[in-house]
């Protein structure tokens, strides 16, 4: 019987990014995954995560060129699509008036900061409105009219060496920043590269005919089966 790791992670080697994608400090690690996507980690202990999480199973993206400008206290990363600026080894947390980390989409005024409320986010979806009487509050989605979205993976469970999902250190930050401007297709492609595509059930499992929730009687089901030449195993 296969363990969870072998079932969940197709290729363990893809959990590690290209070595040229890393910019590492004492308490931070920034990984440039694509021209539109960067991973930002912060840990007081200087410990960074390479194991799969309940959301992320692939951090191996094609190598890209990017440019770094840095001083003793600051680092600036330009991917060609956006520019990220960070005060080295400073805590990454929301709720502060002047952010120590920010990113700007090149050639625009679209700026992200850690405390950005992302009010122009187009939100996600709701699966059902059954028995709903109050206003539905949708979760944040990938797409935003601002052209950026922050995915916080800090609280996701980690799949450890014992094949168990465990909680992470509460003092760490593990963020994925999508800076795509109007390239929505590229954003979605990066997301599915990161998380894997959703599994699809076989087409035959969806059934052999469509109906409007009619209450079929046994004889009617037999008639449909004969008319549609439905196989017994289906």
Residue positions per predicted region:
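Catalytic domains of carbohydrate-active enzymes, especially glycoside hydrolases
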Residues: 220-234
């Amino acid at each position: 019987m296969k363990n969870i790791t072998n079932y969940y992670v197709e290729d363990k080697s893809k959990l590690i990014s290209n070595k040229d994608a890393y910019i590492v400090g004492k308490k931070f690690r920034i990984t440039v995954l694509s021209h539109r996507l960067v991973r930002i980690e912060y840990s007081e202990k200087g410990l960074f995560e390479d194991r799969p999480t309940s959301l992320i199973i692939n951090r191996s993206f094609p190598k890209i060129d990017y440019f770094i400008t840095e001083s003793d206290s600051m680092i600036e990363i330009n991917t060609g699509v956006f520019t990220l600026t960070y005060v080295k080894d400073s805590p990454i947390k929301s709720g502060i008036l002047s952010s120590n980390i920010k990113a700007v989409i090149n050639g625009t005024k679209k700026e992200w900061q850690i405390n950005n409320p992302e009010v122009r986010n187009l939100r996600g979806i709701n699966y059902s409105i059954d028995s709903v009487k109050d206003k539905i509050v949708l979760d944040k989605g990938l797409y935003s009219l601002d052209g950026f979205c922050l995915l916080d993976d800090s609280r996701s469970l980690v799949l450890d060496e014992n094949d168990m999902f465990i909680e992470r250190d509460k003092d760490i930050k593990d963020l994925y920043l999508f800076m795509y401007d109007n390239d929505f297709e590229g954003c979605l492609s990066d997301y599915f590269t990161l998380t894997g595509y959703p599994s699809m059930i076989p087409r035959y499992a969806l059934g052999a005919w469509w109906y409007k929730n009619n209450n079929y009687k046994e004889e009617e089901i037999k008639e449909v089966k004969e008319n549609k030449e439905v196989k017994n195993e289906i």
